[in-house]
């Protein structure tokens, strides 16, 4: 492709409303343009990278035995009402009525639709297993769309759904998809982690998220330094702390005037935050519950919600705290509370700790479990922290990372097939419920996450597999006939060798051309100038390393072809 015949509207300045690097660079590189809040046009360069990701996804899904189909974006309300998600999904589900007053939604996901297809067509165990997938634009009406393609309202997604006769067969389908996802993100050239995760609104028994590692990532993840354990911080398990062996000291009430926070109380009393236990009041389905965590730990509301088995969980407001404890916020404690108390495992072995006294400006010292109060139950309800011992092995400890979720695989079990009555007849002629899995990849989000991980001050640094072009040929002086002839020859020969090449044939200063090439992130740059050409040489520069190599003109195409072939695993 010749630059003068292509559409690359680059920007010199960063738009003021672009907050994260990927959004800034995709706008500046002419890859996307905003149409409305959270809705973007994919311009030619951006679409090329998206198509690269789609191709890798299709190849690996096909390799894993999945079958492509395409389902409508518009879905009837009846299906969502059958699964009960019409009420549960909330305002992210864009709902509307047609001219006959029938209700529909714009699909954010397709569990209901694909289950409806299968319940109509599958009758026997002999028709399974199979896996159906599609690549399609989805819509979720995010309350605050931001960060460009990272959190848009419309986005391109690959969603797949497996159908099996039982749980063990479904586990095999799940593992196939898990391995396919690993291959997909490896082929995209990304550094990532597959982590244990919460199933969220999709539901099901278990799931894994695929996280691209990036300092700007919204999600916190942990991994072990010694074994393969990795999890989203919402799901990560904490190993119980060893019990303290100190003798209990007498309970003591101390004045802590206007000292509410952990930092204020511990500084005032001269103790470490690990010697204080926070009493956090939550409301679970309308019922107050006290959650106890160490002062240097944070409550994991998702763990607590699963433990309590509630539909809704929220922090108690000031009025509720005062009504339950008799004290203002900041002075709650477990001693004397007449509600359910859930204590974190790290609290279980503690003695002589500090808590609120359920009275304003007062705390209790030397609180001891068993003597002063007894929790209703102990459970892992905290977020892990950097350096925690690994819950799976004896040797390792947990490291914290930031990540961007680009893929998620779920074991759905019979959640949707039971709700929509998707059944089959087994070998004995008995009716059974179909077991399902679902598997999503954010195609457009993967491109944005790649940029978050791969950039510098000059622009994007695309990995070769998903770069819009593999190589750019830059003519230093377009008025030099020999330079242009050499560029033309390189351009045609690179194309013939299977290299995707952009020929920058613009009549611009070399500095402008080089800046644009760096901004766009094309991995390899061949520079043809009259001085080097007089010696039969051209310059090859790596966008990632910045290394420059002078090559014989005759060997330049072979060199580039080999670099590209190695990166693509050809």
Curated annotation (Swiss-Prot):
Enzyme Commission no: 6.1.1.15
CDD domains, per the entry: ProRS-INS, ProRS_anticodon_short, ProRS_core_prok
Source taxon at top rank: Bacteria
Gene Ontology molecular function: aminoacyl-tRNA deacylase activity; ATP binding; proline-tRNA ligase activity
BP-aspect Gene Ontology terms: prolyl-tRNA aminoacylation
Subcellular location: Cytoplasm
UniProt keyword annotations, A-Z: Aminoacyl-tRNA synthetase, ATP-binding, Cytoplasm, Ligase, Nucleotide-binding, Protein biosynthesis
Main location group: cytoplasm
One Pfam family this sequence matches: HGTP_anticodon
Region span, Disordered: 238-257
Record InterPro entries: aa-tRNA-synt_IIb, aa-tRNA-synth_II, aa-tRNA-synth_II/BPL/LPL, Anticodon-bd, Anticodon-bd_dom_sf, Pro-tRNA-ligase_IIa, Pro-tRNA-synth_IIa_bac-type, Pro-tRNA-Synthase_IIa_type1
UniProt catalytic activity: tRNA(Pro) + L-proline + ATP = L-prolyl-tRNA(Pro) + AMP + diphosphate
GO cellular component terms listed in the entry, alphabetical order: cytosol
Subunit organization: Homodimer.
PANTHER family xrefs: MITOCHONDRIAL RIBOSOME PROTEIN L39/PROLYL-TRNA LIGASE FAMILY MEMBER (PTHR42753), PROLINE--TRNA LIGASE (PTHR42753:SF2)
Domain comment quoted from the record: Consists of three domains: the N-terminal catalytic domain, the editing domain and the C-terminal anticodon-binding domain.
Family stated for the protein in its record: Belongs to the class-II aminoacyl-tRNA synthetase family. ProS type 1 subfamily.
Role, per record: Catalyzes the attachment of proline to tRNA(Pro) in a two-step reaction: proline is first activated by ATP to form Pro-AMP and then transferred to the acceptor end of tRNA(Pro). As ProRS can inadvertently accommodate and process non-cognate amino acids such as alanine and cysteine, to avoid such errors it has two additional distinct editing activities against alanine. One activity is designated as 'pretransfer' editing and involves the tRNA(Pro)-independent hydrolysis of activated Ala-AMP.
Name under which the protein is recorded: Proline--tRNA ligase
Organism: Geobacter sulfurreducens (strain ATCC 51573 / DSM 12127 / PCA)
